Amino acid sequence: MESETLTAKATITTTTLPSHDETKTESTEFEKNQKRYQDLISTFPHEKGWRPKEPLIEYGGYWWLPSLLEGCIHAQEFFQARPSDFLVCSYPKTGTTWLKALTFAIANRSRFDDSSNPLLKRNPHEFVPYIEIDFPFFPEVDVLKDKGNTLFSTHIPYELLPDSVVKSGCKMVYIWREPKDTFISMWTFLHKERTELGPVSNLEESFDMFCRGLSGYGPYLNHILAYWKAYQENPDRILFLKYETMRADPLPYVKSLAEFMGHGFTAEEEEKGVVEKVVNLCSFETLKNLEANKGEKDREDRPGVYANSAYFRKGKVGDWSNYLTPEMAARIDGLMEEKFKGTGLLEHGK
């Protein structure tokens, strides 16, 4: 099955790709191709998903929610990365919102003072658009119309990234998180979705599906490993970070991220505490307590299926212990040990 879906990718990515500065991304472009995407997706294997009316579709060795797969195919076909672009790559619920805030604050620190930074009034997701969500479904958001924007994000597995991303030479940062906490964060997050597709499966059933790789963009461990291997082959193009180590001591990692992005902090900035200011501005505690991220407030640029507050639950390391039994924890730990054995991944970031 995997070879068939990878062949499908090859078939749909032969289009001549324009620069995303020049791409006509009106909603009609996605809409006129959407039926073709849906017809293609209807031929792929599917399984029961975490909601009764939302199946998971197999494509390229990974599992997808139908709408996100449509967006992925559209990005593969039409998104054209430039060498100057920078992508925040991740699996869902692994620190994406935090990393988006950091990359935006680092890249734009000379444009705003402490009181005028847009992060104080708007959600970080508004400034670093997803190439498989915002680009196809919401092409009119202001950040996509800004030709000077170079920050983008994606949950797309490395093997299925648009060819232009891989070939352009643009840089990427990938963040991963301990799988047990990732699962709990995802399961609780899905309960906050505004949807008519039915309730989320109970904890035990959802956990079993997660362990079997049946989750959006899953299997999660494969997702991590693919980016890890790409990082090992291209350390000058990919920065590989772990959520837990960054949370424990963010300053050195933020400095490394800035240097990697080409926006390194000067000695004068370090003396003035600019690094600390960026870390504090983007901290979980700061962002969660901003008015823009409270209650049922939505992002300003487009409709959202989640309120802004949904992206800020606890941000704690080890919260899984409040939900999972020792047997469940042992199961996922065993899967991780088996998958990552001999790769050097478990030792990275310790």
Curated annotation (Swiss-Prot):
Pfam family, one: Sulfotransfer_1
InterPro entries in alphabetical order: P-loop_NTPase, Sulfotransferase_dom
Catalytic activity: an aliphatic (Z)-desulfo-glucosinolate + 3'-phosphoadenylyl sulfate = a (Z)-omega-(methylsulfanyl)-N-sulfo-alkylhydroximate S-glucoside + adenosine 3',5'-bisphosphate + H(+)
Region described as Disordered: 1-28
The enzyme's E.C. designation: 2.8.2.38
Reported impact of residue 301 to G: 25 time reduction of activity with desulfo-benzyl glucosinolate as substrate
UniProt: 3'-phosphoadenylyl sulfate binding residues: 93-98, 177, 185, 243, 313-315
Catalytic residues in the record: 155 (proton acceptor)
Biased composition (Basic and acidic residues): 19-28
Organs and tissues of expression: Expressed in roots, leaves and stems. Barely detected in siliques and flowers.
Subcellular location: Cytoplasm
Keywords from the UniProt entry: Acetylation, Cytoplasm, Transferase
Regulation: Inhibited by phosphoadenosine 5'-phosphate (PAP).
Effect seen on changing residue 301 to G: In strain: cv. C24
Inducing or repressing factors: Not induced by coronatine, methyl jasmonate or high sulfate concentration.
Sequence positions bearing N-acetylmethionine: 1
GO biological process annotation, one example: glucosinolate biosynthetic process
GO terms assigned for molecular function: aliphatic desulfoglucosinolate sulfotransferase activity; aromatic desulfoglucosinolate sulfotransferase activity
Cellular component annotations (GO), alphabetically ordered: cytoplasm
Biased composition (Low complexity): 1-17
Activity sensitivity to pH: Optimum pH is 9.0.
Family: Belongs to the sulfotransferase 1 family.
Additional facts recorded: Strong differences in the kinetic behavior between the same protein from different cultivars.
Role noted for this protein: Sulfotransferase that utilizes 3'-phospho-5'-adenylyl sulfate (PAPS) as sulfonate donor to catalyze the sulfate conjugation of desulfo-glucosinolates (dsGSs), the final step in the biosynthesis of the glucosinolate core structure. Preferred substrate are the long-chain desulfo-glucosinolates, 7-methylthioheptyl and 8-methylthiooctyl, derived from methionine.
Protein name in the entry: Cytosolic sulfotransferase 18
Native source species: Arabidopsis thaliana
